[in-house]
Structure formats: C-alpha cells, structure tokens
C-alpha cells in the first residue's frame, strides 16, 4: 500500500486590545483594497454558522499563495489547471505585484512598535526524506518570510509537539494545539501560518463594573452581555447601500483599525452580507466621515476552529485537493515530486475585546498527501448581531474578520 503524503495548511490568529489615549491622525485606507477573495471566503464561512465566528482570511490567503507558487511549471509557457484555478480565485494574476505586496506587509509587521504587537510567521514542517527545491525555498523565504524545519512524520507524537510548540511560541501561548498526532497520519509536509495581534485602542473605553444590558440575538430571545460605552469623534457612516451602520475604532500606532458593521434594525447579518462585495464595501468605507458618535459595544472573548476544505471548494479552489493537483516546484524525494496534493486546510482562531483593546490570534495549517493515496451625535448601539474586521490600513489588508451572534466574555 502506498504511503499517503499529506500537505497540511494550518492558520492561527490572536487579537488583544488595550489602550492609553492618543490622538488619531490616521484615517481609513483610501486605496484599492485587494479583498475579493477575502470577502468571498468570509461570507462562505459566515453563512454556515449561526454562532460567533472569528478567522483570518489573510492567513488562509498567504498559504494558498505559497501553494500557488509551487504550482509553477518549467515546461515552457504551459500553465497547469492548478495554477490557473488558484490565480483566478485568489487574484494572483501579477506574481511580481503579489510578491511585492506580501514582502512589504511582512517587513512592516516585523518592525518594532511600542504601541502594539503584530507577529506574522510561516513555517514548513518537512519530512526527513523530502527535499524542498532550492528555487522554491528562496521564493518562499525572500517574498513570504517562510522558514523550513525538518521533522519525522514516522514519529507523529514528537512532530505534533514540535508544530504545536512553534504555534504557541508565536501566539504568546494563546494557541497551544493546532495539530494532533492522529491528524498527521500520512503527512509529508505541514505548512503553518500564525498571526498574532495585541493592540491598544487609541481612545480606550471607561472601565465600568457590571455594565450589563440585553443583547438581542437572531433567535429573538435577549441574553445579558457586558457592555462598554463612550462618546467621541470616530469615522462613521450609515450606509443605505449596505443597510448598516459602519464604525471605525483605531488602534495606537497609526497602522491598524477595527471596523464594526451593524445591520439596521430592519436588516439581518445575512441580508447585509448579501449586499457586501469588494466594490460596495469600498464605497461604504470611502463615505465614512468623522462624527460625534455615542458608541455602545459588548465585550466578547471566544475561540473558533474550522476545517476549510469544503468552504474553499465552494469558492472555486478544488484542484489542489484532487488527484490532478500539480505542485512540481514544492519538493522532490521519495513519493514527493508530482505526487502530492493538499489533504486538509484547518484554521483555529480567537479574539478578546474589552475596554482597553483587543487580542486576536489565528493559525492555519495545510497538509499535503500523496495524490495516489454625519449630523449631530450618531448612536452606534451594537446590542444585536454584527460583523467586524481588523485591517492593516497601510495596505488595506483584512487581517481578521468575524461576526457576533451572542457576545460571551
């Protein structure tokens, strides 16, 4: 029986907020966002869950881009179906632009900043008998800051511990387990990306003990939630096109911000999601202006994990999971070259939001296998389900996204 050779993709993300008051001199990103895939992927996940969700579309996309890089071919100008499909879905038509984009973002994330912690890291955990092709190693390291570590999948307990320890280290201990020994059965390569963010609100909320009020979930029955409140000048818009209010809360450091999309009382989260696409969201964010806003938000803290194979197939990424997968630049060695496919993509994420700020984290894993085997004071009262996302505003990159159906803190 042939050994199954898996490539696993794992993602992890973490977000934490704290704050000391500081002037917000940095407004929303005004350029063209590259978020078509992000929104399509997020909407696919959201529609399958009637509960709280948090995930990192960025973490998924960077690993899929690394798989895209491996789908290149040395046979003249031929383009494999694997590469064509990935390019179409994740919008990698210009690979030089894509590489420059990731390199710029990752180098920016590595800069020391006293106002926030942002850590993005990618690692290949490769079986001893697999040799990753030098050209691919150079591409992965130079443009995506990806590192490589040799492990022995014949000892899955030790390898799982190695991977989990790496994830824990890069998320400040918030994520302790992304793989288990059983989940590594047949694996030859595991690609892991982690993203960790701990930020301070530019304008922290006053801490008030036991500020408990009703939260009206989709089922109509109110539950109690702990709220935080403040008045201040914030970027805000009530979008008629989306049928929702949009609020921006910046973090210290003039780099990142959190956006909240609150459906109007006569709309639901799903109805707003149906109206959101790259163009409509860009327009809604463009129309945001500084207003005096009375902000009421629930505090929340939760983790979320999801197998991503099915959602990704629903948005058009199918070939990497099939017997027809073509990843010739990834590796060579016994049972590797032209004989690997992606078996599993998995993400685990978490988020904490309170008066001081937020903490969020996510890890994504990909496993490859042998393929043979306004006017006046605005009121923003988030006492009903809403959507949120955290953006790196230097490039308009959506790092985290989620929805709240029942705030638990």
Curated annotation (Swiss-Prot):
Residues 1-21 form the signal peptide. Glycans are attached at residues 294, 324. Protease CLIPB9 binds to SRPN2 via the hinge region resulting in the cleavage of the reactive bond. This leads to a conformational change in SRPN2 which traps CLIPB9 and distorts its active site, resulting in CLIPB9 inactivation. It holds the Pfam family Serpin. A motif (Hinge region) lies at residues 356-360. The record marks 371-372 as: Reactive bond. It is found in: Secreted. Gene3D superfamilies: Alpha-1-antitrypsin, domain 1, Antithrombin, subunit I, domain 2. Changing residue 358 to W: Inhibits interaction with CLIPB9 but does not inhibit CLIPB9 peptidase activity. Cleavage of SRNP2 by CLIPB9 is not affected. InterPro entries: Serpin_CS, Serpin_dom, Serpin_fam, Serpin_sf, Serpin_sf_1, Serpin_sf_2. Changing residue 359 to C: 6.7-fold reduction in CLIPB9 inhibition without affecting the interaction with CLIPB9. Disulfide bonds: none annotated. The keyword Glycoprotein applies. Coiled coil: none annotated. GO terms for cellular component: extracellular space. Changing residue 358 to E: 3-fold increase in peptidase CLIPB9 inhibition. Does not affect interaction with CLIPB9. Disruption phenotype: RNAi-mediated knockdown in female causes spontaneous melanization leading to the formation of melanotic pseudotumors and a shortening of lifespan; spontaneous melanization is reduced in double SRPN2/CLIPB9, SRPN2/CLIPB10 and SRPN2/CLIPB4 mutant backgrounds. During the mosquito midgut infection by the rodent malaria parasite P.berghei, severely reduces oocyst numbers due to an increase in ookinete lysis and melanization. Does not affect ookinete formation. Causes proteolytic cleavage of CLIPA28 and CLIPC9 in absence of E.coli infection. GO terms for molecular function: serine-type endopeptidase inhibitor activity. GO terms for biological process: defense response to protozoan; innate immune response; negative regulation of endopeptidase activity; negative regulation of melanization defense response; negative regulation of protein processing; negative regulation of proteolysis; regulation of immune response. Transmembrane segments: none annotated. PANTHER family: SERINE PROTEASE INHIBITOR 27A, SERINE PROTEASE INHIBITOR, SERPIN. Forms a covalent heterodimer with protease CLIPB9; the interaction inhibits CLIPB9 protease activity. Forms a covalent heterodimer with protease CLIPB10; the interaction inhibits CLIPB10 catalytic activity. Interacts with CLIPB4 in the hemolymph of immune-challenged female mosquitoes; the interaction results in CLIPB4 inhibition. Serine protease inhibitor that functions in the melanization-mediated immune response. By preventing the activation of phenoloxidases through the inhibiting of serine proteases CLIPB9, CLIPB10 and CLIPB4, negatively regulates melanization in the hemolymph. By preventing melanization, has a detrimental role during P.berghei parasite mediated-infection and invasion of the mosquito midgut. Belongs to the serpin family. This is Serine protease inhibitor 2. It comes from Anopheles gambiae (African malaria mosquito). The gene is SRPN2.
């Amino acid at each position: 029986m042939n050994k199954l050779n898996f490539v696993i993709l794992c993602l992890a993300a973490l977000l934490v907020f704290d704050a000391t008051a500081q002037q917000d001199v940095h407004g929303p990103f005004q350029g063209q966002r590259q978020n078509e895939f992000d929104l399509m992927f997020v909407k696919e996940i959201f529609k399958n869950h009637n509960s709280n969700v948090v995930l990192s579309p960025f973490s998924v996309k960077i690993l899929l881009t690394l798989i895209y890089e491996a789908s290149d071919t040395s046979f003249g100008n031929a383009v494999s179906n694997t590469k064509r499909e990935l390019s179409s879905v994740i919008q990698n038509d210009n690979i030089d632009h894509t590489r420059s984009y990731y390199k710029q973002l990752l180098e920016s994330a590595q800069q020391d900043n006293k106002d926030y912690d942002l850590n993005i890291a990618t690692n290949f955990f490769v079986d001893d008998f697999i040799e990753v092709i030098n050209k691919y190693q150079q591409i992965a390291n130079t443009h995506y800051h990806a590192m490589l570590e040799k492990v022995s999948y014949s000892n899955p307990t030790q390898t799982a511990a190695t991977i989990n320890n790496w994830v824990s280290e890069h998320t400040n201990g918030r994520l302790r387990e992304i793989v288990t020994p059983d989940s590594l059965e047949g694996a030859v390569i595991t690609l892991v990306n982690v993203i960790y963010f701990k930020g301070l609100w530019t304008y922290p909320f006053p801490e008030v003990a036991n500020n408990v009020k009703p939260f009206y979930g989709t089922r109509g029955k109110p539950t109690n939630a702990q709220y935080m409140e403040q008045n201040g000048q914030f970027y805000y818009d009530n979008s008629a096109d989306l049928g929702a209010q949009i609020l921006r809360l910046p973090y210290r450091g003039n780099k990142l911000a959190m956006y909240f999309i609150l459906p109007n009382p006569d709309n639901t989260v799903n109805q707003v999601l149906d109206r959101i696409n790259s163009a409509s969201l860009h327009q809604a964010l463009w129309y945001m202006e500084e207003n005096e806003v009375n902000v009421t938000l629930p505090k929340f803290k939760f983790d979320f994990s999801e197998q991503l194979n099915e959602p990704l197939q629903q948005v058009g990424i199918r070939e990497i999971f099939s017997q027809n997968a073509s990843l010739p630049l990834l590796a060579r060695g016994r049972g590797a070259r032209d004989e690997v496919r992606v078996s599993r993509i998995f993400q685990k994420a978490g988020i904490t939001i309170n008066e001081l700020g937020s903490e969020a984290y996510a890890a994504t894993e990909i496993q490859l296998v042998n393929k043979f085997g306004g006017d006046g004071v605005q009121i923003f009262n988030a006492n009903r389900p809403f959507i949120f996302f955290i953006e790196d505003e230097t490039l308009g990159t959506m790092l985290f996204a989620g929805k709240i159906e029942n705030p638990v803190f």
